[in-house]
């Protein structure tokens, strides 16, 4: 039996800055607003947490449940709406050596910097019992060169292709998600070829095949072990054939007029969803909530989800425990519980945050999850399959986010008509300047 899921509260912090100041919320009872590190108080263990966006632990009621099951524990969670604001404060506290919470959230874009420069400030989970259930590539993202595991995975962002069934029908293309997936199985070039067919045969006004070519570029790059950096931390984007192949294919799509030129999460993209301006968008699991919200009730059942040509990941976070926490052992126990397969499956059903635990992916309460908005697509199975396809090791870099954004801007130049070689040169100059 399938289980429908609603995505109304899914976290977008890893892709878009949510508005909001720091808000102090307690798992139970009322906080005094001054908590930093926890400790022992009134016979109870107080554990403090610093998080961002909607990581799901407070919103799903898991913190309250843990307190009920462990009456000697009190959890005080401070949540920032904006991850950038949160991380800036975390860096300040790390440099000062005070003001840290016992548990700190770590966004994937910060993982490399944490493992390279802050390993001494975070506890090692490598020997913690019951933490061997994560997807290998997820665990590798937060592991130091000498094998320390500085956090445990919360969610992940495996990618698929979201598409408009009604538009595919008007282009004479299959609409069944399995048949659609077969159109481009194994090769992103096939995805672009389908776009050429769509543009040629679509009947029903002006509709672009894809929202922007940068989504295609990101999906191609994120599906490989090495992207912008090598294992030594050296920049290789200009030498990595994967990056250049992705650039050229994205440029081919732009030159063919397949793009609506609407960059994801930039002005114009939301109206594009509402107005049905494009037929496909490369979508990580967490993006479904945004699409359903912005495309609106009028488009429910018109969208569907198909397997992407290759597995890739965009997004995800971790929970780490600070090394000098006065309740380090208790905090590690809480993190292990919050990120266990059962709790990851629960948050997925409640909020849509996709599990990073390979054991969770095998659970029926994940595999059987469907999305009513996306034509009852079996999203648990689709995104689970994508997560398993991702290479076991992914090499992250300290400036991955900056480089990704710069490539997005460079491809926008191509969409606007600039020659790809000139746009590449401009992009490379901007990257070199940004990363030093």
Predicted regions and their residues:
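Conserved N-terminal structural module of periplasmic/extracytoplasmic solute-binding proteins
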Residues: 2-111, 130, 175, 326-330, ...
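Short helix-initiation/N-cap motifs at beta->coil->alpha
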Residues: 79-89, 108, 183-190, 261-275
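Paired acidic/hydrophobic, glycine-rich loop segments that form the ligand-binding mouth/hinge
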Residues: 102-105, 279-284
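Hinge/lid segment of periplasmic solute-binding proteins
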Residues: 107-160, 302-304
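Short, solvent-exposed loop/beta-turn-alpha elements that line the ligand-binding surface or hinge
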Residues: 124-134, 178-185, 206, 226-245, ...
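Glycine-centered hinge/linker elements that transmit conformational signals in sensory
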Residues: 192-196, 232-263
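Extracytoplasmic/periplasmic substrate-recognition and gating elements
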Residues: 294-356
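C-terminal capping/gating helix-and-loop segments adjacent to ligand/active sites or protein-protein/ligand interfaces
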Residues: 374-431
């Amino acid at each position: 039996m399938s289980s429908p899921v609603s995505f109304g509260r899914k976290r977008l912090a890893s892709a878009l800055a949510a508005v909001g100041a720091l808000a102090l919320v307690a798992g139970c009872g009322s906080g005094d607003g001054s908590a930093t590190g926890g400790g022992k108080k009134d016979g109870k263990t107080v554990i403090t947490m610093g998080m961002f966006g909607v990581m799901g632990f407070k919103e799903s009621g898991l913190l309250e449940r843990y307190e009920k099951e462990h009456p000697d524990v009190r959890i005080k969670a401070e949540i920032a709406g904006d991850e950038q604001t949160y991380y800036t404060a975390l860096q300040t506290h790390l440099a000062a050596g005070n003001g840290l919470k016992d548990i700190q959230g770590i966004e994937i874009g910060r993982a490399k910097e944490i493992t390279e420069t802050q390993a001494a400030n975070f506890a090692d989970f490598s020997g913690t019992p019951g933490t061997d259930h994560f997807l290998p590539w997820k665990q590798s993202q937060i592991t130091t060169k000498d094998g320390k595991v500085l956090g445990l995975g919360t969610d992940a962002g495996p990618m698929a292709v979201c598409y408009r069934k009604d538009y595919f029908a008007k282009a004479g293309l299959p609409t069944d998600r399995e048949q659609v997936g077969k159109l481009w199985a194994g090769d992103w070039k096939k995805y672009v070829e389908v776009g050429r067919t769509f543009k040629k045969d679509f009947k029903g006004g002006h509709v672009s095949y894809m929202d922007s070519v940068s989504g295609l570029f990101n999906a191609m790059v994120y599906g490989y072990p090495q992207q912008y950096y090598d294992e030594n931390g050296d920049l290789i984007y200009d030498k990595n054939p994967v990056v250049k192949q992705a650039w050229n294919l994205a440029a081919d799509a732009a030159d063919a007029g397949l793009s609506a030129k609407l960059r994801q999460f930039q002005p114009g993209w939301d109206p594009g969803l509402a107005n049905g301006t494009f037929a496909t968008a490369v979508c990580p699991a967490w993006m479904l909530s945004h699409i359903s919200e912005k495309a609106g009730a009028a488009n429910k059942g018109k969208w569907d989800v198909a397997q992407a040509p290759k597995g890739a990941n965009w997004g995800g976070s971790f929970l780490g425990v600070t090394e000098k926490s006065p309740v380090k052992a208790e905090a590690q126990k809480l993190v292990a519980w919050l990120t266990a397969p059962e709790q990851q499956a629960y948050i997925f059903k409640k909020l849509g945050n996709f599990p990073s635990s390979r054991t969770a992916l095998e659970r029926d309460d994940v595999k059987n999850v469907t999305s009513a908005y996306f034509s009852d697509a079996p999203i648990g199975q689709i995104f689970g399959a994508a997560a398993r396809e991702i290479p076991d090791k992914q090499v992250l870099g300290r400036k991955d986010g900056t480089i990704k954004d710069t490539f997005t801007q460079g491809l926008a130049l191509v969409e606007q008509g600039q020659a790809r070689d000139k746009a590449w040169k401009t992009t490379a100059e901007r990257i070199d300047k940004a990363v030093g």
